[in-house]
Curated annotation (Swiss-Prot):
The gene is rimM. The PRC barrel domain binds ribosomal protein uS19. Binds ribosomal protein uS19. This is Ribosome maturation factor RimM. An accessory protein needed during the final step in the assembly of 30S ribosomal subunit, possibly for assembly of the head region. Essential for efficient processing of 16S rRNA. May be needed both before and after RbfA during the maturation of 16S rRNA. It has affinity for free ribosomal 30S subunits but not for 70S ribosomes. Keywords: Chaperone, Cytoplasm, Ribosome biogenesis, rRNA processing. Coiled coil: none annotated. It holds the Pfam family PRC. It comes from Campylobacter jejuni subsp. jejuni serotype O:2 (strain ATCC 700819 / NCTC 11168). It is found in: Cytoplasm.
């Protein structure tokens, strides 16, 4: 598997107590994936970490083979990854919910006009913004290279993950024009 087959799920913080627990900073929307016996990859290594105990109340985690403070200090600031395949298995979506990695690289359309493709998703508190890299034909016409569409019903009509397409209302092109 290549790096693109994995998704960031957490960052490990400082040690907590003397028994090897470390602070877990969840970077996903799915805290349910952090449970006993769950395994994660460490960035840029083939090493896997297996959870021995997870305390959801204070977001601390204890990994097998890191059951003392000195050993656990080696984990500070590491990023944990999970395969996209395993994420699909362990993280259940509700109707009209999508994984970030499924939205990224989707083409964005307003009616028959291709506006661009999603290159990032930003959290703004109450909602999300899709960062769109404008289609070359709009850039050649001096429109901005990047613009943002709020992930709200007013702007996003339909998302078709199978076809990798997002269909927007008439207001999306207005955003591009006025960016």
């Amino acid at each position: 598997m290549s790096e693109k087959d994995f998704v960031q799920v957490a960052k490990l913080g400082k040690t907590v107590g003397l028994k090897g627990y470390v602070k877990l900073h969840n970077l996903s929307d799915f805290s349910s994936q952090f449970k006993k016996d769950a395994t994660f990859f460490i960035k840029n290594t083939k090493e896997m970490l297996k959870i021995k105990h997870y305390n959801a109340n204070n977001s601390t985690v204890l990994f097998e083979n890191y059951e003392d403070i000195e050993k656990a200090k080696e984990l500070t600031n590491l990023i944990l990854f999970q395969s996209i395949e395993k994420s699909r298995q362990t993280c259940k979506l509700k109707k009209d919910e999508f994984f970030y990695f499924d939205i990224l690289e989707c083409e964005v359309f307003e009616e028959d006009k291709r506006l661009g493709k999603v290159v990032d998703i930003l959290e703004t508190g109450a909602s999300y913004l899709f960062e769109i890299q404008s289609d070359e034909k709009w850039v050649e016409k001096k429109y901005p290279k990047i613009f943002f569409i709020p992930y709200l019903d007013k702007f996003v009509k339909n998302i078709d993950i199978e076809k990798r397409q997002i269909f927007c209302t008439q207001d999306a092109f207005l955003i591009l024009e006025n960016s």
